[in-house]
C-alpha cells in the first residue's frame, strides 16, 4: 500500500496536513472579512496558539503533522515549481503585461520563505516596494491587495482531499478560495514528499476552467470499504460529484458514491458541519438538517465507462448497505433546541476522528461533548474561541494524507 493513502474516516490517522493561521489573518478586517468568507475578524495571536494546541494534540496521538507553509517553502526551492506558481498566480490577464512582468521579476528574486508568506497571506499595494509604469497600480488604493490573502487556507480539508489511493485537487466554488488549489497542485507535483510517489490525481489538476463542476473536501467523507459519501452543499455541485465519481470508478478506487442533497446555506456549508464519522458504526449528526428524507443517490460503475445513478430514499440505509452494517449508531447534537443550534454553529459536529471512537473537538461544545462521552466516544478537547469564529472545526482544519482502512 502507498503511504499516500486514506482508507476511511475512522481508521488510525497517521499523517495530516494543517495550516497555522498567521499573515492572512492580519489582513482580515471588518471591511473585507465577508468578502473573504469570514463572519468576523480573529485575534491573530490567540488563533495561532489554539492551532498550536490542535497540532500538539495530534502529535500526542502519534499523528505526523505537516504544515502547509513549510511544504510551500520547500516546493518553491524547486525552480520549475517556483516558475509555475509565479506564472499561474501572476498572469498578464490579471495584472496587465507590464505590471505582471514587474511583479514576477520582484517575486522571483525574493527568498522562498518570504514568498510563501505572501502567497498564503497576501500583499497590499502599500506593502509593495517596487514601482511600475503600468496604469493598474496607479489606480489602486494603498490598502487594496496586489495578492489577495487566503485566510481560508486554514481549512486544509477543502482544497484537496485524499480518497483511497489518490487525491482530488478540488475546483473551489468561491472566488476567495480558488487560488488555494494551485498551491496544493504545486506541492503534490514537486515537493519531495509527493513527487514520484504512486498515487492517482482524480480530478482538478488540469489547466482549465471547471465551470460548474465544483467539489470541496468538507463535503467528501471516505467512509471505507470502497464507498464515498459526498454532500451536495452550497460549495459542491452534482456536476462536481459526477466528475469525481467517474474518475474514482475509472481508477478502480471506489465501488460506490452516495450523494446527499443538502440545504444551501452557510450553517451547513459542507456535509462535515452537520455530519461526521466517529467510529466504524457511529456518526455525529445535526438532526435539524440531516433528515432521513433528504434526496439521496447511489452512483455505481456500469463497467463500460459509464455510471448507474439510482435514487435512494434514506441516506442512513444507503450507508448501512455500503458498510455492511445492520444499523448505524447516530449521536445527535447535544442540549435543547437552542443549545444544539448554537453548538452546531460552533462546529460541535465537525470533529476529527484520530482512531476508532476517539475524536478531537472544541472544548466549548459542552452539551454535545457530554453526549459523545456518554455514547462511548472519547473527545480530546482543544480551545476554539478564536478558531471557531472562522466557521470550521477540527475536521475542517485538517487534510488526512495517510489513514488506515477499517
Swiss-Prot record:
GO cellular component, one term: cytoplasm
GO biological process terms, semicolon-separated: arginine catabolic process to ornithine; arginine deiminase pathway
Active site (UniProt): 396
Catalytic activity field: L-arginine + H2O = L-citrulline + NH4(+)
EC main group: hydrolase
Annotated metabolic or biological route of this protein: Amino-acid degradation; L-arginine degradation via ADI pathway; carbamoyl phosphate from L-arginine: step 1/2
Pfam families in UniProt: ADI
SUPFAM superfamilies per UniProt: Pentein (SSF55909)
Similarity-based family: Belongs to the arginine deiminase family.
Name of the protein in question: Arginine deiminase
Species of provenance: Vibrio campbellii (strain ATCC BAA-1116)
Amino acid at each position: 500500500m502507498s503511504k499516500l493513502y486514506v482508507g476511511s474516516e475512522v481508521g488510525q490517522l497517521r499523517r495530516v496536513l494543517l495550516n497555522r493561521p498567521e499573515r492572512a489573518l492580519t489582513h482580515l478586517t471588518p471591511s473585507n472579512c465577508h468578502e473573504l468568507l469570514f463572519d468576523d475578524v480573529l485575534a491573530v495571536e490567540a488563533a495561532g496558539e489554539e492551532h498550536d494546541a490542535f497540532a500538539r494534540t495530534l502529535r500526542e496521538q502519534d499523528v505526523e503533522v505537516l504544515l502547509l507553509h513549510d511544504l510551500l517553502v520547500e516546493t518553491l526551492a524547486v525552480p520549475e515549481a517556483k516558475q509555475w506558481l509565479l506564472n499561474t498566480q501572476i498572469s498578464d490577464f490579471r495584472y496587465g503585461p507590464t505590471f505582471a512582468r514587474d511583479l514576477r521579476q520582484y517575486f522571483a528574486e525574493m527568498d522562498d520563505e518570504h514568498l510563501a508568506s505572501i502567497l498564503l497571506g497576501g500583499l497590499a499595494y502599500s506593502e509593495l516596494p517596487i514601482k511600475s509604469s503600468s496604469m493598474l497600480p496607479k489606480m489602486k488604493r494603498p490598502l487594496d491587495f496586489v495578492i489577495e490573502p487566503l485566510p481560508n487556507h486554514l481549512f486544509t480539508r477543502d482544497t484537496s482531499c485524499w480518497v483511497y489511493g489518490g487525491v482530488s485537487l478540488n475546483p473551489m466554488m468561491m472566488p476567495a478560495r480558488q487560488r488555494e488549489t494551485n498551491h496544493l497542485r504545486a506541492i503534490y507535483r514537486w515537493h519531495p514528499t509527493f513527487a514520484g510517489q504512486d498515487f492517482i490525481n482524480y480530478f482538478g489538476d488540469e489547466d482549465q476552467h471547471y465551470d460548474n463542476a465544483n467539489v470541496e473536501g468538507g463535503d467528501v467523507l471516505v467512509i471505507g470499504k470502497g464507498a464515498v459519501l459526498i454532500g451536495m452543499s452550497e460549495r459542491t455541485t452534482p456536476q462536481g460529484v459526477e466528475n469525481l465519481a467517474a474518475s474514482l470508478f475509472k481508477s478502480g478506487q471506489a465501488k460506490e458514491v452516495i450523494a446527499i442533497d443538502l440545504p444551501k446555506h452557510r450553517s451547513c456549508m459542507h456535509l462535515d458541519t452537520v455530519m461526521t464519522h466517529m467510529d466504524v458504526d457511529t456518526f455525529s449528526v445535526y438532526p435539524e438538517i440531516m433528515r432521513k428524507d433528504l434526496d439521496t443517490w447511489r452512483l455505481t460503475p456500469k463497467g463500460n465507462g459509464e455510471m448507474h445513478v439510482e435514487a435512494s430514499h434514506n441516506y442512513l440505509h444507503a450507508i448501512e448497505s455500503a458498510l455492511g452494517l445492520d444499523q448505524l449508531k447516530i449521536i445527535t447534537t447535544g442540549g435543547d433546541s437552542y443549545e444544539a443550534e448554537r453548538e452546531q454553529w460552533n462546529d460541535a459536529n465537525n470533529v476529527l476522528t484520530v482512531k476508532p471512537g476517539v475524536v478531537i473537538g472544541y472544548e466549548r461544545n459542552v452539551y454535545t461533548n457530554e453526549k459523545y462521552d456518554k455514547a462511548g466516544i472519547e473527545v480530546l478537547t482543544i480551545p476554539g474561541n478564536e478558531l471557531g469564529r472562522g466557521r470550521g472545526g477540527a475536521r475542517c482544519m485538517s487534510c488526512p494524507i495517510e489513514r488506515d482502512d477499517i
